[in-house]
Amino acid sequence: MQKIVIENKTPIFDARHLRDYEYGTISGSKTLSISSSIEERQKQLLGIGKEQRIVVFCQSSGCGYSDEIAQFLKFNGYSNVVIYRGGYREWEKNRFDEKHAVTKP
């Protein structure tokens, strides 16, 4: 995940609620909140190719929001969706790279 963030070529989406995203998120990620409307989700996906790899994450491995957003993406034709299971909690705990650890949007 650290490499993906540093390369900044793969879209990374935070599936948590907007208030959690605003509190802090993985550097370079955008919100694709579980509570957002279909229209809001489609707006966030503009310009992303259907075959481009997309990473989705949630709070932790016990959070199902990333699974629901991944299903939404697949249903809408995005074929290369992966879930970062450790989520924000793992990223923040490990602070993989202080320069790219956690940012506020």
Label every model-predicted segment:
Residues 1-23, 99-105:
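Flexible, polar/low-complexity N-terminal or interdomain linker segments that lie immediately upstream
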